Amino acid sequence: MAKEYSRTQRIGDQMQRELAQLIRREVKDPRVGLVTITAVEVSRDVGHAKIFITVMGQDSAEEIAQSIKVLNAAAGFLRMQLAREMKLRSVPQLHFHYDESVVRGAHLSALIERAVAEDSQHPSTPEDAKE
């Protein structure tokens, strides 16, 4: 029987909590907006971690790219701080990525709302009622 909750998932969850606090507390760069860590994927060998983020208030691709660049530049510092907080033999290398799923989800929700609004504007015909 497979483990329901693997070690890498537990490490990822703890890293997500710790990194959220560290970024808020330690990263003072004004180019980084309000960062939300949406997910952390840790490799099986615990050598690398992909950190997926969204940045509140930054909609343009340039601003988002700048935030990612700043966070990737601070990855070594954040990794060192994580090592102090977490009790791991080795802390994974951090790689920050923008999480586009939130933007895609909002876009799909807007499309659904628009389709529902268009359907409510068209009266149903008797042929539709028979089906």
From Swiss-Prot:
The keyword Cytoplasm applies. Monomer. Binds 30S ribosomal subunits, but not 50S ribosomal subunits or 70S ribosomes. It is found in: Cytoplasm. Keywords: Cytoplasm, Ribosome biogenesis. Gene3D superfamilies: 3.30.300.20. This is Ribosome-binding factor A. Belongs to the RbfA family. It holds the Pfam family RBFA. The keyword Cytoplasm applies. One of several proteins that assist in the late maturation steps of the functional core of the 30S ribosomal subunit. Associates with free 30S ribosomal subunits (but not with 30S subunits that are part of 70S ribosomes or polysomes). Required for efficient processing of 16S rRNA. May interact with the 5'-terminal helix region of 16S rRNA. GO terms for molecular function: ribosomal small subunit binding. GO terms for cellular component: cytosol. It comes from the Bacteria. One of its GO terms (biological process) is maturation of SSU-rRNA. InterPro entries: KH_dom-like_a/b, RbfA, RbfA_dom_sf, Ribosome-bd_factorA_CS.
